[in-house]
Amino acid sequence: MSQTPLVTEAEITAEGLKPQEYTEIVRRLGRHPNRAELGMFGVMWSEHCCYKNSRLLLKQFPTQGPRVLVGPGENAGVVDLGDGLRLAFKIESHNHPSAIEPFQGAATGVGGILRDIFTMGARPIALLNALRFGDLKEAKTQQLVKGVVAGIAHYGNCVGVPTVGGEVYFDPCYAGNPLVNAMALGLMETPEIVKSAASGIGNPVLYVGSTTGRDGMGGASFASAELTDESMSDRPAVQVGDPFVEKCLIEACLEAFQTGAVVAAQDMGAAGLTCSTSEMAAKGGVGIELDLDKVPVREQGMVPYEFLLSESQERMLFVAAQGREAELIEIFQRWGLQAVVVGRVIAEPLVRVLYRGEVAAEVPARALAEETPLYERECPKEPPAYVQQARQWSVDQLPLPARSPAEILLTLLATPSIASKAWVYRQYDHEVQNNTLVFPGDGDAAVIRLRGTAKGIAATVDCPSRYVYLDPYEGGKAAVAEAARNLSCVGAEPLAVTDNLNFGSPETPVGYWQLANACRGLAEACRALQTPVTGGNVSLYNETIDSNGQPQPIYPTPVVGMVGLIADLQRVVGQGWRATGDAIYLLGLPLTTPLSDPRLSLGGSEYLAQIHGLVAGCPPQIDLDLEQRVQAVCRYGIQQGWIASAHDLSEGGLAVALAESCLSGQRGATIQLPEGTYPRWDALLFAEGGARILVSVPPREQVAWEAYAQAQLPNAWTRLGVVNGEDTELCIDSCNNSPLIRVTIKELDLAWRSPLPKYLD
């Protein structure tokens, strides 16, 4: 083997490898790698595949719990729902591909996350997505939104999996680097959970699914780099998906897993054949010999480098029980899919690649998949300058706006991040499979029926990214708390988390400070709320290079996907008022809380950003003890049948939450603010903070409800008013009975429904 370099410095750099990493590769191999081997290391040592900058931080996440069956390290996490039911779930990002080719980038993001689910032996039952875009007034943003939403809709609708929920936010920081995070859930259909560790020396290795082409070349390395003008034309790095092939692949895989002939399975996602062979071999402590001449192709003249790095979609790798490969091949051929023996499990712990009868690459499996670089960076002790400057702002510097409270409420409802997302979710089929009980826009979380039982599951994705930007630690806590609160608002007990960490470069002090502190906040909140992390995704280098050559990172955006269990589907509520005469209560921090209390703040609020054009101040601190108690009271009230509706207070504070419940229920509300409230009406109506939920309760339940609330939440519940009738108005009066807001449902509706169609139709 060669002792002189077989590749150029330019080729090393093009693979995303640093000089010291190349030196380490040479040391590990005892020789210089050839071009194919360099490509294998390039993708497997990318941040996207090996988490070299984040793995040490992820170790602080709690990963075990009484319901956790599979934690981090497999294709998806799995939790026990009781009665023999098991739920697989996972979130993944497809940010960089979606920036380049929005339709295919988003579509293949959906396809990839679905494969993670059914590779475990679970049938996909639901999809959610968390999307971030730039300023909606910009033509480029409009093009991205249309492409991404169409791609998600196309793939999910064609494959027959409902898209049941998600979130969409707009901020200029995402202009050049949108975020497309897709989450999927599935119910286990196989007796045993299908794992990915190869075993059984001599067992055949099967390639199943679609053919291999040059699409998606080096996608994992591409996903670990900053976006530049050059990379924006890098379309070969974007995969092309076929949802109809994926649908056949789902059915064929689930049928194959039922036979017991599959020893291990791995989907070919990022890094394609390289990742699937090296991960399966490394996890099993064995090796895999792969013959590229047997791989089904869709393009001629492909060389080993292209075979190994292709990210063509809808492909899987199996290890089969020896002698049973024909049985599996028959199943896949019956579904119209490729199925070929392309290799075997070997005792030497290597990935050995054959091409035209010769060894084209030979690399220790653990060097690619387990013993990858790990960077321990020093986290700055002092917050960066932008945070220190933001913390100097105080509410005393803020003049009361000249506009009326009603005008400001309507303005906030018309901001794209708060406005109705019906334009988005009406393109998704959220009813296919006929198990969706709470539709997008109707509740704080999606609810899916578990057929044959009285149970349901709820799911949500959340991240207050402006909070995380201003205070990553509190923002990380807030992301977990809001996800759990949203589940609690439909009556679900939060079970577990899958996280998607979208950040800028960890190689800058600011970037690493944001990442490290957000992880600390996420970990603390997950422990406090008893929602272990079962896996997830890290997407770093979400930056665009501006015209001056300077990287412009996104807001740090750790999206929390959370699942919950509903014991009785008869006890599920939405966010809209249900009946005239129902009393309206605020759970959590009372409106008499002084603005000096750090748990309530205009800092980092939607009001401050949209009305005053300021991103400043300290976001609200999360009181995890109060959060637990408020959520538990809300869940119990729903389970007892006392609560008719529940909605958490998030962007826009009290006034926006009241308006959203009016809009969802198409009923008005009469609100009388209690005595002793703070004097600033803007803070009273629009300040934000955790652990706050609006609930409505029918008259016949109010005595029992109030007794329970007082016992469990003394001084942390407030009766605010009453639901006042269909198609009426939202009336909010101050404590001295002077009217603050009088807005009809029609006015609210017009402001809230118009923004997205205005820019996107």
UniProtKB/Swiss-Prot annotation:
It catalyses: N(2)-formyl-N(1)-(5-phospho-beta-D-ribosyl)glycinamide + L-glutamine + ATP + H2O = 2-formamido-N(1)-(5-O-phospho-beta-D-ribosyl)acetamidine + L-glutamate + ADP + phosphate + H(+). One of its GO terms (molecular function) is ATP binding. Mg(2+) 2 binds at residues 116, 267. CDD domains: PurL_repeat1 (cd02203), PurL_repeat2 (cd02204). It is an enzyme of class 6 (ligase). Monomer. Part of the FGAM synthase complex composed of 1 PurL, 1 PurQ and 2 PurS subunits. This is Phosphoribosylformylglycinamidine synthase subunit PurL. The lineage of its organism: Bacteria, Bacillati, Cyanobacteriota, Cyanophyceae, Acaryochloridales. The gene is purL.
